[in-house]
Amino acid sequence: MLFRSDILKDASATAIYGSRGANGVILVTTKKGKEGKVTLNYSGTVTFETLHDVTEMMSAAEWLDYARLAKYNAGSYASATPTYEADKAAFGSVTASWKNIEKAWVNGVYDPSLVGSYDWASHGKQTGITHEHTLSASGGSDKFQGYASFGYLDQKGTQPGQAYERYTLKTSFDVTPVNWFKMGSSINASYSTQDYGYSFSKSVTGSGDFYSALRSMIPWTVPYDENGEYVRYPSGDVNIINPIRELDYNTNQRRTFRASASLYSQIDFGKIWKPLEGLSYRLQFGPEFQFYTLGVANAADGINGDGNNGAQYKNEQKRAWTLDNLIYYNKALGQHNLGMTLMQSASAYHYEMGDMRATNVASSDELWYNIGSAGTLNSFGTGLTETQMASYMIRLNYSYKDKYLLTASMRWDGASQLAEGHKWASFPSAAIAWRMDQEDFLKDISWLNQLKLRIGMGVTGNAAIKAYATKGAITGLYYNWGQNESSLGYVPSDPSQKEPAKMANPTLGWERTTQYNVGVDYGFFNNRLTGSIDAYKTKTDDLLLEMSIPSLTGYVSTYANVGKTSGYGIDLQVNAIPIQTKDFSWSTTLTWSMDRNRIDELSNGRTEDVNNKWFVGEEIGVYYDWVYDGIWKTEEAEEAAKYGRKPGQIKVKDLNNDDTIDANDDKKIVGHTRPRWTGGWSNTFSYKNFELSFFILSRWGFTVPQGAVTLDGRYMQRKIDYWVAGTNENAKYYSPGSNGEGADAFNSAMNYQDGSYIKVRNISLGYNFTPQQLKNLGINNLKLYVQAMNPFNIYKACDFLDTDLVNYDNNTKTFGSPTTLKSFVIGVNIGF
């Protein structure tokens, strides 16, 4: 139902939305009915999706070489070279798995090519098939226009046990019963069911999804013995549990119903009484609802069940609404045009939840529908969150000859989640524009179609913290009295808990960002070359972030206005039609953007906050650690010893050259979460009825916090270049087992990878049938197309991750992915 979306980047435009414009504004225009005969449209796609490995794992023989070295260095493998006896002692505790190693020992000689292996990962992926169908109808008269669509999506995931099904209903109508009044609505509703698949929680190896757990199994191990019996610990390690049967013992289902609406009515007073011409009133109301349930059942025979049937049932309800009252006044006085908008807005958000988790449920076949039969109720709880916001705004517009444009606004927002006395803030904005192409001295330039200069300033606010975050929460704590007696008490916080309460902040207020921008919109050569150039500068005061604090306070974090930041950026867009003939055309769009930010001031006059990785003069979102400088070589043994190191271990830089490595003086910023720049290039080629398009995306100069490994010879390992004395001393990674069964002391120094990439996001080929081809079928238009999604990378700096799967903002980060998804789509659009 999406018709188009517009991104507002101008400071004045985003400031109109106050706190809601803090992260930019995207205006979404949905499809509506049009005056005329009723039209019927169908669109359908079938998508084939496959899961591909990006990270290459060790083979069975490679893993054995690595594990032997790790165990030898740690003192638990008896020989510097492989022997049957040492292998038997180290890897022979499970007979069924040991046979894959034993077959490589022929007449007392080890042949790595004969090591047997089992393809665990093949059980964890499949071709995902999705089919989606949408049927829509629209039409109307001069007094009524309507639109309705129904959609259905069915998806089989790329991993067994994953599935998703969704129904959608969308309607909109606009009614004009008399020329001075109109009303309308847009309503969206959806219901979905998701089989989430298995999520491990018991074993070290099993953490994560089903496929990842299978890939984490050591390749020479087997899931079943020669009698077909399940092997729980294939390598003999109690932390590496065989996950192959888990889909039979676990259910994880989520159901969601969503509904939202946008309702309006508008009165044009000028059409009722001529002296009020230009005055109108609009009432808008937008309710939203969401009902969500989560059901999890773990059978006793599975890993998560671990001997007891377990169940969880959680439900959530979210309700929100926004009510806007708007008064518009527009007046033309000769070549002068004046406009004024007054707005009063109120919004509210309500969230409630209930969650129960239990073990010793009577039967896993009853899923989560009989938790009352549980022998142990592990946890139960309910919760309520409510927030409100009130807003007022005045905006003035002025234009002269449609060449000189001025906009000014003031908005006031009040947010309930902020502290008393700090809930309200004002957000002014102003902008001017000059349509230079309308000037007499430029009108006669034939190749100039548009040239517009824009200058703006605006203030936006951010109050995005959890409700009640300014108030101190209390935490339940059981006190023991002797051996058999305890009582429940409450304390402000317990830092030892998994999620301790945050310290109250009774002065928490708005984060305010002031932005200045200048931009140019242009169009040349009959608009065959168009685009825009925007530059902006920002300054943020009272930055609103979660801040770590010393646990000796009784807390570990609090929300705080921590300081000031500044930033700047450039956005470029170029649209061109280089070729346009009768049968062939080529259109292309190139976008490029960069932004920088800097911490100018921290609270309490500090210049750095190492715990939060905040440093005055540096960006928000940095990585601060040791600086990797290679691996100590054998001939460097004497030098390494000065630092308490030995050959085969990680070398880090002694930044202050004091012959000591310490955290206070030898760490520095080693990476940034945000890319130095982002670019995109889209192209569409049309030849007669055929259409070919592709899109390329690039993000450059950002850091992915992945790569550090624990080389203890215990768990499955990706293929790496590790240090071996005398034979591979120029390796990137340290010698396995060089720190016993633990990771190297400076292992984190290897945890930062360049995430830069250039990727082809999609390629599409379509055919549009002509009216002459369709005239005997009763069809107005027909398009068939195929599309490849995520087909390949042109370049990527990190060879073991898909770094396109990285999200970032000022305060959070996620990791790249060891797998990537590729899709092939077949689609059809039909109009009647």
Tell me the role of every PLM-derived stretch:
Residues 1-170, 178, 182-184, 188-190, ...:
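Short, small/polar-rich motifs associated with maturation and membrane association
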Residues 32-40, 206-210, 463:
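Short, charged/polar, Gly/Pro-enriched secondary-structure boundary elements
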Residues 41-111, 355, 469, 476, ...:
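Conserved small-residue
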Residues 56-58, 298-300, 356-359, 605, ...:
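Short Gly/aromatic-enriched secondary-structure transition segments
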Residues 104-111, 492-501, 536-562, 589, ...:
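Surface-exposed, extracytoplasmic segments of Gram-negative outer-membrane nutrient-acquisition systems
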Residues 113-120, 378, 662-665:
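Short Pro/Gly-enriched beta-strand edge/turn motifs at strand-loop
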Residues 120-125, 245-252, 381-382, 665-671:
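Asp/Glu-centered strand-loop micro-motifs enriched in Gly/Pro and often flanked by an aromatic residue
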Residues 131, 166, 172-191, 197-202, ...:
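Extracellular/periplasmic, surface-exposed regions of secreted and cell-surface proteins
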